[in-house]
């Protein structure tokens, strides 16, 4: 599982010009699910996302987590995080899990996040979405449950 985590002052996502998810201060999280992902991968990324110390404390040091600040989450599925561009000019998405299996894992990931009692908003799985992100910092972290980076 891969996640692109961005610290935001606000973020929203639209489907067909309708806002389907919107948050204030917190994290915008783009999620990619691979063919090999399991529940353990979901838990690993969930724990990293809610516990990353990327919010500033009173000394302006990145020392606080999303849980510490009681921030909000906007989670958006993005299979293109598994695009392989090493050959040719068009990305290959062979490693991305597709269809219903990916949707089930995505929904399980959302359930795990909601256990943290944080506000969790989402996009619409598989839809064409327009995402507005007001980066804070900017601070952007890339996570990979198979620890490739």
From Swiss-Prot:
Q: Which Gene3D superfamilies match?
A: D-tyrosyl-tRNA(Tyr) deacylase (3.50.80.10)
One of the GO biological process terms = D-amino acid catabolic process
Please give one Gene Ontology molecular function term for this protein: Ser(Gly)-tRNA(Ala) hydrolase activity
- The record's EC number reads 3.1.1.96
SUPFAM superfamilies per the record? Answer: DTD-like
**GO terms under cellular component:** cytoplasm
The protein's annotated catalytic reaction(s) are:
glycyl-tRNA(Ala) + H2O = tRNA(Ala) + glycine + H(+); a D-aminoacyl-tRNA + H2O = a tRNA + a D-alpha-amino acid + H(+)
Mind telling me which InterPro entries this protein's record contains? Daa-tRNA_deacyls_DTD (IPR003732), DTD-like_sf (IPR023509)
Motif extent (Gly-cisPro motif, important for rejection of L-amino acids): 137-138
What enzyme category does the UniProt record give? hydrolase
Q: Where in the cell is it found?
A: Cytoplasm
Keywords (alphabetical) are: Cytoplasm, Hydrolase, RNA-binding, tRNA-binding
Family label:
Belongs to the DTD family.
Q: Present the record's domain note.
A: A Gly-cisPro motif from one monomer fits into the active site of the other monomer to allow specific chiral rejection of L-amino acids.
Question: How the protein assembles, per its UniProt entry?
Answer: Homodimer.
What does this gene product do? An aminoacyl-tRNA editing enzyme that deacylates mischarged D-aminoacyl-tRNAs. Also deacylates mischarged glycyl-tRNA(Ala), protecting cells against glycine mischarging by AlaRS. Acts via tRNA-based rather than protein-based catalysis; rejects L-amino acids rather than detecting D-amino acids in the active site. By recycling D-aminoacyl-tRNA to D-amino acids and free tRNA molecules, this enzyme counteracts the toxicity associated with the formation of D-aminoacyl-tRNA entities in vivo and helps enforce protein L-homochirality.
Which protein is depicted?
Answer: D-aminoacyl-tRNA deacylase
Q: Which organism is it from?
A: Clostridium botulinum (strain Alaska E43 / Type E3)
Q: Which gene encodes it?
A: dtd
């Amino acid at each position: 599982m891969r996640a692109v985590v961005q610290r935001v002052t606000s973020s929203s996502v639209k489907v067909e010009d309708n806002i389907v998810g919107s948050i204030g201060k917190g994290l915008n999280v783009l999620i990619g699910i691979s063919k090999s992902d399991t529940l353990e991968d979901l838990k690993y990324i969930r724990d990293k996302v809610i516990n990353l110390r990327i919010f500033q404390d009173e000394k302006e040091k990145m020392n606080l987590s999303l849980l510490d600040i009681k921030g909000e989450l906007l989670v958006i599925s993005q299979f293109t995080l598994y695009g392989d561009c090493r050959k040719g000019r068009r990305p290959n998405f062979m490693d991305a899990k597709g269809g219903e299996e990916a949707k089930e894992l995505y929904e399980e990931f959302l359930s795990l996040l909601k256990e943290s009692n944080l506000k969790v908003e989402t996009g619409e799985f598989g839809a064409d979405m327009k995402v507005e992100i007001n980066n804070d910092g900017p601070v952007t972290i890339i996570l990979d449950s198979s620890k490739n980076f």
